[in-house]
From Swiss-Prot:
InterPro entries on file: Natr_peptide, Natr_peptide_CS, Natriuretic_peptide_brain
UniProt entry tagged with the keyword Ribonucleoprotein: no
Disulfide links within the chain: 9-25
Taxon lineage: Eukaryota, Metazoa, Chordata, Craniata, Vertebrata
Protein name per its UniProtKB record: Natriuretic peptide PaNP-a
One Pfam family per UniProt: ANP
Matching PROSITE patterns: NATRIURETIC_PEPTIDE
Length: 40
């Protein structure tokens, strides 16, 4: 629901699109590949 989710990917605030679309951009912002790679 936060604009920051989509803002990191498309460059403009995305409210529902970022979450509903699930393009993965929102996930990358919240969970960058660095920590994921280390934990895995």
């Amino acid at each position: 629901s936060d604009p920051k989710i989509g803002n990191g990917c498309f460059g403009f605030p995305i409210d529902r699109i970022g979450s509903v679309s699930g393009l993965g951009c929102n996930r990358l912002v919240q969970n960058p590949p660095k920590p994921i790679s280390g934990e895995s």
